[in-house]
Structure formats: structure tokens, C-alpha cells
């Protein structure tokens, strides 16, 4: 369960990074 949670957090942070990067690219 904990491993799954950590993987989920990892995925979320990756998505957030991608969103930030695309935001910077737009500006």
C-alpha cells in the first residue's frame, strides 16, 4: 500500500513538473 502511494505521488509530481514546464514554454 505504501509503495503504491509513493508511486502515485511520484506520478503526480511528474505531471506537475510537466504542467509547470509547459506553462513556462507558453510564456
UniProtKB/Swiss-Prot annotation:
Keywords: Antibiotic resistance, Leader peptide, Plasmid, Transposable element
Protein purpose: This peptide is involved in the control mechanism of the synthesis of the erythromycin resistance protein.
Gene: ermC
UniProt GO BP: response to antibiotic
Highest taxon listed in the record's lineage: Bacteria
The name this protein goes by in its record: 23S rRNA methylase leader peptide
Amino acid at each position: 500500500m505504501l509503495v503504491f502511494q509513493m508511486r502515485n505521488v511520484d506520478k503526480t509530481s511528474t505531471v506537475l513538473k510537466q504542467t509547470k514546464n509547459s506553462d513556462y514554454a507558453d510564456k
